[in-house]
């Protein structure tokens, strides 16, 4: 019995192991497949993340470049619109250089220093010239005064003897001038004076004409502007009137459509019915009185007809 029991136990263990192997084998296959899929997914995700990072970095670089370009464009437009900056840009830039706002102060200071240096050099040169002239004049004045005085007297005497008179681009000595020459000179001066006066008159006339023309032109321009303004105002008023008429016509059409709509018609009928009921309720007693009077009249007519019939029968019996 014990051997049989042990054998049975061994068989049970073997069967259990086989069943476990059978059940575990598909599980292991599934695990292997999952592991492969996971490994492939992990590798794909790594490369995908790497690609995304590169893409993001490229986009960031593009955005930064666009921002810098836009800033440069804005700076250039500001420089073009500002007259002072545009002049500085023309003077400071060459064919291949670009104007830098950061170097503006340095360039100004350099320009000022150069100007100051030039001024100082000019002052020094002038001072040197003045000193040299003063020394030369002193040397001249230290010469013999007697000779200088004699030379001055001689020059004055010669100048008085050789005074010349110019007329029509010709020179004459005062002592040798005749009356004819003086008449010619007076005639020439009169002609020149008359010409000057005529020129002045002509210029005045021309200026007056120009002023008149300008005034007329200004008046015409003002009149044209007034007419233009009046035309614009008339056009605006016409447009306003047309808009008002159009709006009023649209409102009337909307009202008509509302009146013709089924809801509005139902409301109207309801109102009429309510009015009729109110009238009927208020005049109910009067209607009953009229009916009673009508019934009495009917009875009276019936009686009269009966009497007429009786009279006709009596007349017929007498015949």
UniProtKB/Swiss-Prot annotation:
This is Coiled-coil domain-containing protein PF3D7_1144200. Residues 132-150 have a biased composition (Low complexity). Residues 1-12, 27-36, 112-131 have a biased composition (Basic and acidic residues). Residues 16-26 have a biased composition (Polar residues). Keywords: Coiled coil, Merozoite. Residues 1-43, 112-158 are annotated as: Disordered. The keyword Ligase does not apply. It comes from Plasmodium falciparum (isolate 3D7). Residues 100-134, 166-242, 281-310 form a coiled coil. Possible candidate for an effective malaria vaccine as determined by epitope response in sera.
């Amino acid at each position: 019995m014990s051997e049989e029991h042990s054998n049975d136990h061994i068989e049970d263990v073997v069967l259990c192991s086989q069943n476990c192997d059978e059940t575990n084998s598909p599980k292991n296959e599934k695990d292997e497949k999952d592991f492969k899929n996971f490994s492939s997914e992990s590798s794909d995700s790594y490369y995908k993340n790497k690609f995304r990072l590169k893409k993001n970095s490229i986009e960031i670089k593009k955005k930064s470049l666009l921002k810098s370009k836009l800033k440069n464009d804005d700076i250039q437009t500001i420089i073009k619109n500002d007259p002072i900056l545009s002049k500085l840009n023309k003077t400071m830039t060459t064919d291949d250089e670009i104007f830098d706002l950061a170097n503006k102060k340095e360039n100004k200071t350099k320009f000022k220093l150069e100007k100051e240096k030039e001024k100082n050099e000019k002052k020094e040169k002038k001072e040197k010239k003045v000193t040299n002239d003063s020394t030369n004049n002193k040397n001249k004045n230290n010469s013999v005064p007697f000779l200088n005085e004699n030379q001055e007297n001689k020059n004055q005497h010669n100048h008085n003897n050789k005074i010349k008179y110019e007329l029509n681009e010709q020179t004459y000595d005062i002592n040798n001038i005749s009356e004819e020459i003086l008449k010619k000179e007076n005639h020439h001066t009169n002609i020149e004076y008359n010409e000057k006066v005529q020129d002045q008159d002509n210029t005045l006339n021309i200026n007056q004409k120009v002023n008149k023309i300008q005034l007329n032109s200004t008046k015409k321009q003002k009149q044209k502007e007034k007419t233009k303004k009046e035309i614009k105002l008339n056009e605006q008023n016409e447009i306003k009137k047309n808009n008002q008429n159009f709006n009023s016509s649209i409102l009337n059409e909307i009202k008509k459509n509302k009146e013709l709509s089924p809801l509005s018609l139902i409301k109207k009928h309801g109102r009429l019915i309510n009015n009729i009921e109110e009238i009927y309720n208020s005049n109910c007693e009067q209607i009953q009185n009229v009916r009673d009077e009508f019934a009495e009249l009917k009875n009276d007519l019936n009686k009269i007809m009966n009497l007429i019939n009786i009279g006709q029968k009596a007349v017929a019996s007498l015949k």
